[in-house]
């Protein structure tokens, strides 16, 4: 017997509410695949083109339209004209390679999709040098004139420093085979995965990463550095825009090209690309996507494990302490494993610790710490990766954060090939992008991992047994074993787990296409953290997801960054809050929220909210609200009893003295 049906027997269903509920469910992110992978396609007018029509052209256009309309004849047997076009394309594929767009056409396409590509150079050092060599007579000028000249010079230098380029855009994945000479098997795998129209990041990145000389062939007037051996690349794109596929396709294509140039067989594997991800879940996802693209190519995409042995070059180095600082507490275990392997080589009886053969790897996907433990080697020595030609940092802003920065820099130093190319990918980047890439400096963001299991214990009893009970709630944190984390990820993707409690770092980049809602139990420490959290519901431009943020009185000063991000995204989507278009952030709310200084924002990133860091009332408890209320009432009753006893002790002697002074009734 269904108790809900019995209780609602006398209630008549409302057909309007059913229709609204049905319409709402179809708009959820889990409703299906997005038919439109591109987020932007703004109309951009042609540059330098006359808008006034000529007399001859004005008369010619209708004739062309009439000719196009006259071709639609259902009784005409002639079909030679439409059949001639595909035959010409098939007979002369070389013409499609040479056919490139002009710089003006590239500019229009890139701007219509809101794409901007710039060259990052060493201009700041030149600026410092010129400022130091200024003559003393120039510094004695008036303050007003000095400010004007300095502002103009800085603006000119800034424009020269941020030189914008317009490479060839990728309009369809079919161009990879003909224009950029991608392997036929790789092109077939891309088509088998259903990729037809590229997203914005794929449109701008793939031509530069596959063949930069071809992509920049039509660029004029740009001081382009030497890119014959590849180029370092930094990409900032929204979550769910296909960044994983964008850096995997050039990595696999580069392995195939170098294998063909060197004449190696498919059985000969050389480690040529390393993909670094901050979490194991994201690394596992990258491996799965890479193996789909590498079917039939002979390229092996492998996930780094502790027992994996790579072909490295071991050199003596007295400065191996840099590796020890980045490896952390688990470095000792890696050293013990390496020492155990060396001892096992001399012992014939112990078969479990025998030296393992070299792993056959072309593309290695890893997290920073496990690779660094392998590279640490013995004391006084370090291991290098001289064959690596491509180093890829996924979620680069986290890997260059002080939380992972030492480990990431140590891995970069281990890749000693002179032509190694570094590519960084993320959905958010700091404002000082150049300093982030060159010096690997970013403010630390340390997080408390204790609230994650505590919140899981708090929520696991809220789902009734009829719906699955505590099995519908799962927790994911770095203290768990790798096998347990993989099982939870598989259960969540299969729909067995409804609520997943996790942290910022573990949720970054992992593709959860069917997530309909995100609950921020704690206010994000920055706008970038909110973008990554809310991006779970908007993968590849899906609409209908809900992101709910809880905040307390202590969080009010830091809510404005989140509100600004929401307001900017709604403005970009054409949603107006005051006009009744469904906006969630009102103007009065933005004006009422206090402004936060940069120093306070820095402290928030480094130390978090002060009230939660100190503990006490802000900590998450596993007790129910009824138990907390009962304990609170009991504590208040005990406090009231103690207060009454103190009052009696204070009032007792005074009352006795007053009674002793009374002399009775007078006669």
From Swiss-Prot:
Signal peptide: none
EC number: 3.6.4.13
Molecular function GO terms recorded: ATP binding; ATP hydrolysis activity; RNA binding; RNA helicase activity
Biased composition (Basic and acidic residues): 128-137, 147-163, 625-634
Transmembrane regions: none
Pfam families attached to this UniProt entry: DEAD, Helicase_C
Binding site residues for ATP: 237-244
Domain Helicase ATP-binding, first and last residues per copy: 224-447
Major site of localization recorded for this protein: nucleus
Span(s) of short sequence motif DEAD box: 394-397
UniProt-annotated location(s): Nucleus, Nucleolus
Coiled-coil features, chain-numbered ranges: none
Region Disordered: start-end pairs: 1-99, 121-170, 318-355, 608-667
Helicase C-terminal domain boundaries: 432-581
UniProt family annotation: Belongs to the DEAD box helicase family. DDX52/ROK1 subfamily.
Domain comment as written in the entry: The Q motif is unique to and characteristic of the DEAD box family of RNA helicases and controls ATP binding and hydrolysis.
Name of the protein: ATP-dependent RNA helicase ROK1
Organism of origin: Chaetomium globosum (strain ATCC 6205 / CBS 148.51 / DSM 1962 / NBRC 6347 / NRRL 1970) (Soil fungus)
């Amino acid at each position: 017997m269904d108790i809900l049906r019995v209780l609602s027997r006398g209630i008549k269903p409302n057909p309007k509410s059913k229709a609204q509920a049905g319409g709402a469910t179809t708009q959820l992110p889990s409703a299906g695949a997005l038919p439109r992978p591109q987020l932007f396609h703004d109309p951009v007018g042609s540059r330098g083109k006359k808008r006034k029509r000529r007399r001859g052209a004005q008369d010619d256009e209708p004739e062309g339209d009439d000719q196009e309309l006259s071709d639609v004849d259902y009784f005409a047997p002639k079909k030679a004209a439409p059949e001639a076009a595909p035959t010409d394309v098939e007979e002369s594929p070389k013409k499609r390679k040479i056919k490139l767009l002009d710089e003006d056409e590239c500019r229009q396409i890139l701007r219509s999709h809101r794409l901007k590509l710039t060259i990052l150079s060493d201009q700041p050092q030149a600026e410092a040098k010129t400022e130091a060599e200024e003559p003393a007579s120039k510094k004695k000028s008036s303050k007003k004139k000095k400010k004007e000249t300095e502002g103009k010079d800085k603006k000119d230098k800034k424009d020269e420093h941020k030189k914008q380029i317009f490479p060839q855009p990728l309009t369809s994945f079919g161009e990879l085979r003909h224009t950029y000479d991608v392997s036929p098997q790789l092109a077939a795998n891309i088509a088998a995965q259903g990729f037809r129209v590229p997203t914005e990041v794929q449109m701008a990145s793939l031509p530069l990463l596959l063949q930069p000389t071809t992509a920049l062939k039509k660029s004029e007037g740009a001081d382009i550095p030497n890119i014959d051996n590849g180029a370092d690349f930094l990409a900032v794109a929204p979550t769910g825009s296909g960044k994983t596929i964008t850096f995997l396709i050039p990595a696999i294509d580069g392995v195939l090209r170098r294998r063909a140039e060197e004449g190696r067989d498919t059985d000969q594997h050389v480690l040529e690309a390393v993909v670094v991800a901050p979490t194991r879940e994201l690394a596992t996802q990258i491996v799965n996507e890479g193996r789909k693209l590498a079917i039939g190519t002979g390229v092996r995409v492998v996930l780094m494990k502790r027992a994996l042995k790579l072909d490295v070059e071991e050199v003596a180095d007295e400065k191996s302490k840099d590796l020890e600082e980045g490896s952390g507490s688990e470095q000792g275990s890696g050293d013990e494993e390496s020492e155990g392997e060396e001892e096992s080589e001399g012992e014939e009886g112990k078969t479990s610790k025998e030296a393992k053969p070299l792993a056959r790897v072309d593309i290695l996907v890893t997290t920073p710490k496990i690779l660094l433990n392998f590279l640490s080697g013995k004391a006084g020595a370090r291991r290098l990766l001289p064959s690596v030609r491509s180093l890829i940092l996924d979620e680069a802003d986290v890997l260059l954060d002080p939380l992972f920065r030492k480990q990431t820099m140590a891995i970069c130093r281990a890749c000693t090939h002179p032509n190694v190319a570094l590519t960084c990918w993320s959905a958010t980047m700091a404002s000082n992008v150049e300093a982030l890439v060159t010096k690997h400096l970013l403010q630390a963001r340390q997080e408390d991992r204790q609230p994650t299991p505590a919140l899981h214990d708090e929520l696991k009893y809220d789902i009734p047994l009829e719906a699955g009970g505590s099995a519908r709630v799962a927790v994911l944190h770095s203290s768990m074993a790798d096998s347990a984390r993989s099982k939870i990820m598989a259960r969540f993707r299969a729909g067995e787990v409804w609520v997943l409690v996790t942290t910022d770092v573990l949720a970054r980049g992992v593709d959860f296409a069917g997530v309909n809602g995100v609950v921020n139990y704690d206010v994000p420490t920055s706008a970038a953290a909110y973008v990554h959290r809310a991006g779970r519901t908007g993968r590849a431009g899906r609409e209908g997801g809900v992101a709910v943020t809880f905040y307390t009185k202590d969080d009010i000063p830091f809510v404005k960054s989140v509100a600004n991000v929401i307001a900017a995204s709604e403005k970009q989507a054409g949603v107006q809050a005051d006009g009744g278009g469904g906006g969630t952030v009102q103007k009065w709310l933005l004006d009422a929220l206090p402004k936060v200084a940069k120093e306070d924002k820095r402290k928030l990133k480094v130390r978090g909210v002060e009230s939660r860091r100190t503990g006490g009332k802000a900590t998450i408890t596993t007790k129910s609200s009824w138990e907390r209320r009962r304990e609170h009432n009991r504590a208040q009753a005990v406090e009231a009893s103690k207060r009454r006893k103190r009052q009696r002790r204070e009032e007792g002697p005074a009352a006795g003295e007053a009674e002793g002074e009374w002399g009775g009734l007078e006669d």
